[in-house]
Structures are given as structure tokens and as C-alpha cells.
Curated annotation (Swiss-Prot):
Homohexamer. PANTHER family: PHOSPHATE ACETYLTRANSFERASE, PHOSPHATE ACETYLTRANSFERASE EUTD. It is an enzyme of class 2 (transferase). The N-terminal region seems to be important for proper quaternary structure. The C-terminal region contains the substrate-binding site. Pathway: Metabolic intermediate biosynthesis; acetyl-CoA biosynthesis; acetyl-CoA from acetate: step 2/2. In the N-terminal section; belongs to the CobB/CobQ family. In the C-terminal section; belongs to the phosphate acetyltransferase and butyryltransferase family. It comes from Buchnera aphidicola subsp. Baizongia pistaciae (strain Bp). This is Phosphate acetyltransferase. Involved in acetate metabolism. The gene is pta. GO terms for biological process: acetyl-CoA biosynthetic process. It catalyses: acetyl-CoA + phosphate = acetyl phosphate + CoA. GO terms for cellular component: cytoplasm. The keyword Disulfide bond does not apply. Residues 392-715 are annotated as: Phosphate acetyltransferase.
């Protein structure tokens, strides 16, 4: 079983690339076959359409990866559309190739130009839309409970609020960032009376602070200063915005450490100052010149000198500037004081490149701070949430339809929405579509609306084939005294003609109803195709794609007032449909009362129907009578029926009659602005599906896909 892990950053500049590479290294050490995907990156004129982690993997050829999706927050789409595009992209890349790898590692979105709240929003949407195991990545630079509490607050209030999200734990990065003071390696934050200590994996304090909130610490990666060595150009010029007084190979000089100059000491120890950025507070010009002389005299290789509180370099004489060059390093200045500079350095995003020695540090040192017990546990199967997620449901619907590619008949061939849907299905290989109607009229409608009708869309003129089905109709209805003349009249109805075409098995399924009535679809199906073995009735079900999961509503379109036996059959049919589409059925037999709290004919009918379901399908999880709020909401369920296996977790909702079912499905669909697919017909020998007259093109496409799957999977 392929495990799908997503690293979700909490905050900005947390060293996500470092952690991703460390986790990859730990996984490879445990002999896992890993595939990497960065979810998305922001469009930029300066980037190369690839993220930092993928770029390193590309340059080192160390791991298979997939290029990220490029998103443009300024010029393209709404945020909602962007989030859905990212989810669709991940699904198309990950789920199509999952079986080839042991682990799919997804790196969450981290914004460079917006607040990290945007990253949280996008990563939350991804997390709740696809079945992944979430590992949070955060940086705790100052060992304070306040800092950790803020991270825990975000996890609890942004991510944990959704019951679908699989949270595995957290990896903490950059625990011990150091800025070295002269002589003694004093931690910078000690200067400001902050107690930062080095914390190794499994530190009791970190374990306690996270685990008391139900979050397991999967790694504590200490700061390793030699890993991140920015160039003088990157750090001083681009990041700090310092004024460059003297440039000596800024691009090729790298900063190994930072040193705040101590006026009470001389610069003699070459080892301590080697490749450092020497930060000099406000002192006299003579003292600055003296420092440069000492650097030259003691042959110390300093990367750069940064003069703080340096207001205007142009006020200094040229001779003074020339005298500084004796230090043989880049000289720069800033009007900021030492404290401001240090604060900026603290926030600097040290960016990895593909230097071999940096990658060796990650592989040989940093990756060992990832909990290998967790990594090894990934070889075992993992029970993801059984809830069917909307985005995953749609992906599987289209993916499986492409796999089977059945021929679906659309008798309302001259309807614009039908023509558009057929074109989309053809373009995306969802189905072969056959349009019934006047070919010239259909082609004119398509042309005037810029719709492409591919060669695999067949158009049949019903006038040319009606006579072919007269005898068959007479045979099928022979016990009802049908005459040849009457049959000739009946086949002029496209609903009857299309049902006869399906019955002859020249097509695999039938979708109609965008301009017709439900009865005009169901009656010919009942008369000519008949109910499936073991079924005494045809019922309907709607797939309701709520914000966080998919449920089934039945019967909302066919049976007006079913009795207890019929209601039980509808429940069993609906549970079978749920299984067919990968949804684990937990059936709620709905009523206005829960358990024994109410009385009346409807309650009694639902009680009896529940008993019949339990008798006929003893392995089916079913409960009733139960109210809608108790069936769908866990909090209400705990109060009204705490011992129910269905309450709060129902996936199949059976309404007592058509009145309540039809009203509820339309109220939920319109009020919550959700997608519903249906009515999907059940209990029939061959797939026939009805469309609501208000169906959108998208609704029709999905109904066609469902019909393809019914035709394929039911056998």
C-alpha cells in the first residue's frame, strides 16, 4: 500500500526544503521507493517554474520528482478556483501513479509574497480534499512555550477542526540558530536575556508541549551553521540592503558565521573570524581603521565587514574608504543599529543550493534527527479515514470512467447542454456518446456555440431507425395486447426508442431528462428493461458532495410514499450503490423522531423498515428511526443516541417519503451551494439515469460518468 505524506509548513521561512530533503534521506535510508511532488509555487518572472526542493533533486538526480503547479494570485482565477486547481493537479499526478511507489511525499504550499495565513488556507484545503497523512513543519527559534502555543493553536483551529484530516505529527526545525559573539561562541539571544538551549530529538519539554495537545513530535532538527552559508551578495546587498562601500568578489565570498565586534578585544584569532560577517557597532573612524589593519596584519580571511549606525557614507572622505580596503574583504554599511541588524539576520531565510557538502550534511547529519521509528512504520498499511472526500470522489469517477469508456446514449441530442456535455466527455475520454436527433440541427447548434464534436461522437437520426425497433417492441409488450400500428406510434417517442436501443445492447447506458419528465424516463425502462433480479421496484439516489464528504440521499425522485417493505428495499439498493462507488454505507433511516422519542404512522413505518433491513442484510450498519441532525452531527448524536454506530457518521440517508426527500435535497444543494449528482436510478436491469431539468452541463457530465461506472462495475 502506498503511503502519501504531506509536509505542511506552519509559518514562513521555516527551512521547508531542508526538512523535505532530510525526510527523503531518512526514507531512502530505510529503503523506501519515494516520489516527490511540490504542490504548487507562485508565478514569478524570475523563477524557473520549479521549487527549491525539486531543483536540488533535479540537479543531483537523487530522486524522482514531479514539477509543481504554477499559480498566479494576481492575474488568474479566484482563490477558491486556485485551491481546487491545486487539488485536481495533485490528484492527477499522485493517484495515477501511486502503485509504483512506496511513499508519495508532497511538500505543502509556502508563500513567498503573501502572509502565511494564505499558506494555511491552501494547505488546509488540500488536507481536507485528499487522503494524505499530515506532518507539520515549524521553526521554534526561541524556546518559549508562547511560540509553541501559537503553532499548536494554528494546528488545532485551522486543521484539526476537520474530522477528515489525518494528522501524524510535527517536525521542528532550526532549534538552535547561532550568531557567534567574539571569543566564546555566545548565543546571540543570551545577549537579550533569552534562554535558547540546544534541544535534541525527544526533548522532554517539546514532547510535553506538543503531545499534551495530541501532536506527536516526529523530529527535532538542530541548527547546523555550516549548512547554510549565504554569499555576501545575497545576505548584505540583497537581504539587508546594505550600502556597498567596497566590493571584493561578493558573489563568491560565503559567510560561515556572524560576529558582533567587541571593543574590548583585539582581532587576533584567525580561526574564530574565518569567513565571518563582522558586525561593527557605532565607533570612531580611527577605531574602524584599526580593525582593518588588525585583520590585514593577522592574515584573517573575513568575508565582509558591516558598519552599523553608518548614516551617510558620502560624508566620509575618500582616504578613509581607501584605508578600509586593507582588510581585503567586502565593506558595507547600514544606518540600522546592531539590534535591528541582528533581528533581520534572525529572520533571514537561509536558502539551500545544490552544493554537495550541504547535501551531505543533510543526508549524514540532519536526517538522523528525524524519528526513524516513524519512518520505518511507513512500511505498514495505514487506515485512512473511510469518509469519501468530494474531490477524490470526482477524480475516481472520471478516472474509472476513462478506464472503461462505455457508449452512453443521449436521446435529447438537440439540447445545447447535452451537446456540450457530450463534447466534454469525448474530449476527456469519459465516454463514447451517441446523440439521438436531427444531425443537421445538432451540428448547427454545435457550430454556432463553438462546440467541437469529435469523431467518436455518433449522431443518429431517429427517423431512420424507428422501424428497426417496431417488432422488438411488439415482442416485449406481447402480453399487453400491443398492435403493430400502436407500436409504430410508440417508437416515435424518443424516450421509448432510446430505451429499445439500450435493451438491444447497442449502447451501454442511457441518460435523459434534461427537458423531459422523470416518468417519461422510468416508465419505458420498467416496461421494456425491467427491474434487476431481486428488485421489486426502481428507486433513485443523489450523490451529495458536501464540503467535507460525500453522502447519498434516497429516494428523492421516484417513489412518492413507499411502505415499510419498499423503504427497506430502497435502503438496501442505496447501500449497494454506495459500495459500488467506494463509499462505506452507514444507513440512517430518517424520521422526525429518534429511537422511541416519537409516535405516529411515519415513525412506525421507519421502525418496521429498519427491522426489515436488519433482517435481510444483517451485516449492513443501519439505524432508525433517527433524526437528520443526529445522523449527520456527532455532537447531537452524543446527546440523542450515544451508542448508535450510525449517528453522527451516516453516509446513506433514507427519507420516509418523496416529499421530505425532494425538499431536503434541493434545500441542501441550493443553500450550501454544493454539487449533487442524480437522480441515479437503482434496481433496474441496465443503467438508465434521469436528469433534473435544471441540470448544468457539469451535472450531465458527472451523470454520464456515473452511468459508465454502473454499466461496468455492476457486472
Amino acid at each position: 500500500m502506498t503511503r502519501t505524506i504531506m509536509l505542511v509548513p506552519i509559518g514562513k521561512n521555516i527551512g521547508l526544503t531542508t526538512i523535505s530533503l532530510s525526510v527523503i534521506s531518512a526514507m531512502k535510508r530505510c529503503k523506501f521507493n519515494v516520489k516527490f511532488l511540490k504542490s504548487a509555487i507562485e508565478y514569478s518572472n524570475t523563477n524557473y517554474n520549479i521549487d527549491d526542493t525539486s531543483l536540488i533533486l533535479k540537479d543531483t538526480q537523487s530522486l524522482s520528482y514531479i514539477n509543481p503547479l504554477i499559480v498566479d494570485f494576481i492575474n488568474q482565477f479566484s482563490l477558491k478556483q486556485i485551491k481546487q486547481r491545486i487539488v485536481d493537479y495533485i490528484l492527477s499526478k499522485v493517484y495515477a501513479k501511486k502503485e509504483k511507489y512506496d511513499i508519495f511525499l508532497i511538500e505543502g504550499f509556502d508563500t513567498k509574497s503573501h502572509t502565511y495565513v494564505l499558506s494555511n488556507d491552501i494547505n488546509y484545503y488540500i488536507s481536507k480534499s485528499i487522503n494524505v497523512e499530515i506532518v507539520f513543519v515549524c521553526a521554534v527559534d526561541r524556546s518559549s512555550q508562547l511560540d509553541i502555543n501559537n503553532i499548536v493553536y494554528i494546528i488545532n483551529n485551522v486543521f484539526k477542526k476537520n474530522k477528515n484530516i489525518n494528522i501524524r505529527g510535527v517536525i521542528i526545525n532550526e532549534l538552535c540558530q547561532k550568531v557567534r559573539n567574539d571569543y566564546g561562541n555566545v548565543n546571540l539571544f543570551d545577549m537579550f536575556k533569552s534562554s535558547v538551549k540546544k534541544i535534541n530529538f525527544g526533548d522532554v519539554k517539546y514532547d510535553f508541549l506538543f503531545q499534551k495537545n495530541g501532536i506527536e513530535v516526529l523530529g527535532c532538527v538542530p541548527w547546523i551553521h555550516k549548512l547554510m552559508e549565504p554569499s555576501v551578495k545575497i545576505l548584505c546587498d540583497k537581504y539587508l540592503g546594505a550600502n556597498i562601500i567596497y566590493d571584493r568578489c561578493m558573489n563568491s565570498q560565503y559567510i560561515k558565521t556572524f560576529i558582533i565586534y567587541d571593543t574590548n578585544e583585539d582581532i587576533k584569532n584567525a580561526k574564530k573570524f574565518h569567513r565571518s560577517l563582522l558586525i561593527i557597532p557605532a565607533i570612531s573612524n580611527d577605531k574602524i581603521k584599526e580593525i582593518c589593519v588588525q585583520i590585514n596584519k593577522n592574515k584573517i580571511l573575513i568575508s565582509a565587514i558591516l558598519l552599523t549606525n553608518f548614516l551617510n557614507v558620502h560624508d566620509k572622505c575618500t582616504d578613509f574608504i581607501d584605508q578600509l580596503k586593507i582588510a581585503n574583504c567586502t565593506i558595507c554599511s547600514t544606518p540600522n543599529d546592531v539590534f535591528t541588524v541582528v533581528s533581520l539576520l534572525h529572520k533571514f531565510n537561509f536558502k539551500l543550493d545544490n552544493k554537495n557538502y550541504q547535501l551531505n550534511i543533510i543526508e549524514n547529519d540532519m536526517s538522523r534527527h528525524i524519528n526513524l521509528d516513524w519512518i520505518r512504520s511507513l512500511k505498514h498499511s495505514y487506515q485512512y479515514n473511510s469518509i469519501c472526500l468530494p474531490s477524490l470522489f470526482i477524480y475516481n469517477l472520471k478516472h474509472l470512467a476513462k478506464k472503461f469508456m462505455k457508449n452512453i446514449l443521449l436521446p435529447e441530442g438537440c439540447e445545447l447542454r447535452i451537446i456540450k456535455a457530450a463534447s466534454i466527455c469525448s474530449k476527456n475520454d469519459i465516454a463514447y456518446c451517441t446523440l439521438l436527433g436531427n444531425p443537421k440541427k445538432i451540428k448547427n447548434i454545435a457550430e454556432s456555440n463553438n462546440i467541437v464534436l469529435n469523431s467518436n461522437i455518433e449522431i443518429i437520426d431517429p427517423k431512420l431507425i424507428r422501424k428497426n425497433y417496431v417488432e422488438r417492441l411488439c415482442h416485449l409488450r406481447r402480453h399487453h395486447g400491443i398492435t403493430l400500428a400502436h407500436a409504430n406510434e410508440l417508437v416515435k417517442d424518443n424516450s421509448i426508442l432510446s430505451t429499445l436501443i439500450l435493451e438491444s445492447k447497442k449502447v451501454d447506458g442511457l441518460v435523459s431528462g434534461s427537458i423531459g419528465t422523470t416518468s417519461s424516463i422510468i416508465l419505458p425502462a420498467l416496461q421494456l428493461i425491467k427491474t434487476s433480479p431481486g428488485s421489486s421496484l426502481i428507486s433513485s439516489v443523489f450523490f451529495m458532495l458536501l464540503s467535507d464528504y460525500v453522502t447519498l440521499y434516497a429516494d428523492c425522485a421516484v417513489n412518492i410514499n413507499p411502505d415499510a417493505t419498499q423503504l427497506a428495499e430502497i435502503a438496501i439498493q442505496s447501500s449497494n450503490t454506495a459500495r459500488l462507488f467506494g463509499i462505506f454505507p452507514k444507513v440512517a433511516m430518517l424520521s422526525y423522531a429518534t429511537g422511541c422519542s416519537g409516535f405516529g404512522d411515519t415513525v412506525d413505518k421507519v421502525k418496521e423498515a429498519t427491522r426489515i433491513v436488519q433482517e435481510r442484510s444483517p451485516n449492513l450498519i443501519v439505524d432508525g428511526p433517527i433524526q437528520y441532525d443526529a445522523a449527520i452531527n456527532r455532537s447531537v448524536a452524543k446527546l440523542k443516541c450515544p451508542h448508535s454506530l450510525v449517528a453522527g457518521n451516516a453516509t446513506v440517508f433514507i427519507f420516509p417519503d418523496l416529499n421530505s426527500g425532494n425538499i431536503t435535497y434541493k434545500a441542501v444543494q441550493r443553500s450550501a451551494n454544493i454539487l449533487s449528482i442524480g437522480p441515479i436510478l437503482q434496481g433496474i436491469n441496465q443503467p438508465v439515469n434521469d436528469l433534473s431539468r435544471g441540470s448544468s452541463v457539469q451535472d450531465i457530465v458527472y451523470t454520464i460518468a456515473v452511468t459508465v461506472l454502473q454499466s461496468s462495475l455492476s457486472h
